[in-house]
Amino acid sequence: MRAFGLAMVLLAAAGTWSCTERADAQAPAAVAAKAEGAPYALAGTQVWTVPDPVSGREYEVFVSLPASYETSPERRYPVVYVTDADYAFPIIRQIARRVNLEGPVIEEFILVGLSYSRGDSGVASRNRDYTPTPNGPSSAKASLHGQGPAYQTYLKNQAIPFIESRFRADPARRVLLGHSYGGLLGAQVLFSDPTLFHSYVLGSPSFWFDKGHTMRVEADYARSHRDLPADVFMYIGAYEVPGPSPRNTDDADMVGDVRAMEQKLKSRGYPGLQVRSTVLEDEDHLTVAPVGFTRALMAVLPAKRG
């Protein structure tokens, strides 16, 4: 299975529980006077260090506030928590602004990017923190996977309280958005603590992990629960099936897995569940995310009309 690659690097902030405001790019004259170009920074974003006291790891969270945040001091906003923040945070931030240029399409929200643990590579951090069991791909050591439950506890006890104590967040309207292993993490939270978030975006979710572990967890949940109070949106690229193209997946039928999960969830008759999915044509595991992000935000946070 091809890994979900990183595409962008953000500036890091030093210090525990510290904040750095992003600055606008330097003026051309100042840049020209330097031997090297200045790093590109996203204006109006913040980086906070939120450590995990249990594991001792340090994580950064990236924050982008909506345009009306300062002018609407009484308003509380939904919060979108996105995994793989180094890649996804700048993309989602721009989508939210671009789509609304000619009128409201997506409701304004606070965007929170969940970055990787400091000192670890993105691959190592996500393999460890986003997976539910140690039983990863056969080529991987067991120690590299399986700490998703511990990371979920970190989100619940550290990251979310940090955000909600500092920003005007609506705790009843949290959204968790993840792609690939991030979608796998979302499914883990959905079936173990569904009310932690109101909406779940499971993008190209790795339901193949550990021989279909998530499918078994879904069945276990159904045996002991009569409701699943959540709004679930899944997206998948049409190429995410085995096939002759280099864009196809190596062996997992991820499209079939998403369809099977949607069918299973709908068959349960949970009164509090809304679930839907979309297969995006001419997209593969590495290209589908920007389109999937857009469709997902339009689905789970549609702008209020009138």
Short names for language-model regions:
Residues 1-8:
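Bacterial N-terminal signal peptides that target proteins for export
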Residues 22-306:
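Non-catalytic cap/lid and distal C-terminal segments of serine-dependent acyl enzymes
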